[in-house]
From Swiss-Prot:
Gene Ontology biological process terms in this record: tRNA wobble uridine modification
Quaternary structure and partners: Homotetramer.
Catalytic activity of the protein: carboxy-S-adenosyl-L-methionine + 5-hydroxyuridine(34) in tRNA = 5-carboxymethoxyuridine(34) in tRNA + S-adenosyl-L-homocysteine + H(+)
EC class (word): transferase
Origin: domain of life: Bacteria
Molecular function terms from GO: transferase activity, transferring alkyl or aryl (other than methyl) groups
Function comment: Catalyzes carboxymethyl transfer from carboxy-S-adenosyl-L-methionine (Cx-SAM) to 5-hydroxyuridine (ho5U) to form 5-carboxymethoxyuridine (cmo5U) at position 34 in tRNAs.
Sites where the protein binds carboxy-S-adenosyl-L-methionine: 96, 110, 115, 135, 157-159, 190-191, 205, 209, 324
Protein name: tRNA U34 carboxymethyltransferase
Length: 332
């Protein structure tokens, strides 16, 4: 295991000691050791070398409550700013954000801040909570959770470029912001987690429709929550009643890995059957071309290329265009 990985994982293990999640230490270190030996991306070591080249800076201000903004342009000289931007661009494509680092605007494909603005008013206060973000991407929402006062934020996502992007951002925060010791990313899926039944809040945003067995996935989310804990689920939905579920064909909006798109009523039934209560649909929103688009930080195809050019209410395959719902529920 490289020095960087060892440091990242050890920091996570240390934060779990004497916490409600301490029993995770019975399995987690061995799991991460196996990951390091058998599952690392071919580019991973190169990415780590690039991370090591990021300069150490001293951001004078960090804002995680209204954005993810680390420092200002005036904190660094022009050469250092260009060096930082050049290195961060080596980790493209940047899909989830945006981030602001010493005056550099990482203009990501998704305006994840807009999603957070739709979700945040409807959830329990995160202050003092242990939070799990399943399918955390590059960690944008994790930082916002920390900014809301969460005691501990753990993100899980098997995509290793997201893992690297998260640590690129953390590199600029870790030495200037004490709570950064309480935010950790583990390169794994929820299916690799033992049922901890210990998190106060579990987020899963943009994952359910990628699962062949959505009921099993929802059960896995439930298994991570303590009794009374809160689930925040965001996913693609379709219009209809409690019997309506769209199973996409080979592709949906050019994505091959989309399986089930339920109506909000059907999704409510699923959650109820699995033992959730206080289930409420708090937001339904059509994804716009301003919220998901190509940028200089993600310069390949995006949403506009996946919709019918003659009718943007339909995907290029003829399905209803992406509509996303946020559902909040509690474990009985």
């Amino acid at each position: 295991m490289s020095k960087l990985e060892q440091t990242w994982f050890n920091e996570c293990y240390t934060s779990l000691i004497d916490s409600p999640l301490a029993h995770w230490l019975q399995t987690l270190p061995a799991l991460m050791d196996t990951w390091q030996r058998t599952a690392k991306h071919g580019e991973f070591d190169k990415w780590c070398r690039l991370l090591n080249k990021l300069p150490n800076t001293s951001p004078q201000q960090i804002d995680l409550s209204t954005s993810v903004t680390i420092g200002a342009k005036s904190d660094v000289d022009e050469y250092t700013q260009k060096q930082i931007e050049g290195l961060l661009r080596q980790f493209m494509p940047w899909r989830k954000g945006p981030f602001h680092v010493h005056g550099i605007h990482i203009d990501t494909e998704w305006r994840s801040d807009w999603k957070w603005d739709r979700v945040a008013p409807h959830i329990s206060c995160l202050k003092g909570r242990n939070v799990l973000d399943v399918g955390c991407g590059s960690g944008y929402h994790m930082w916002r959770m920390l900014g809301e006062g969460a005691n501990r934020v753990i993100g899980v996502d098997p995509t290793q470029l997201f893992f690297i992007q998260f640590h690129a951002i953390k590199q600029f925060i870790r030495n200037s912001y004490g709570p950064a010791n309480n935010i950790h990313f583990l390169p794994m899926g929820i299916e690799d987690m033992q049922p901890l039944q210990a998190f106060d809040t579990v987020f899963s945003m943009g994952v359910l429709y990628h699962r062949k067995d959505p009921m099993a996935f929802l059960q896995q989310l439930k298994d991570q929550l303590r009794k009374g804990g809160e689930l925040i689920l965001e996913t693609l939905v379709v219009d209809g009643d409690e019997t309506t579920v769209l199973m996409a064909g080979e592709r949906y909006a050019q994505m091959r890995n989309v399986w089930f798109l339920p109506s909000t009523d059907a999704l409510t039934v699923w959650l109820s059957r699995l033992g959730f209560e206080n289930i409420r649909v708090v937001d339904v929103n059509h994804t716009t071309l301003d919220e998901q688009r190509s940028t200089s930080w993600m310069d390949t195809q995006s949403l506009k290329d996946f919709l019918d050019p003659e009718d943007i209410t339909r995907t290029i395959e003829g399905y209803p265009a992406p509509q996303r719902a946020v559902i909040v529920a509690n474990k009985k």
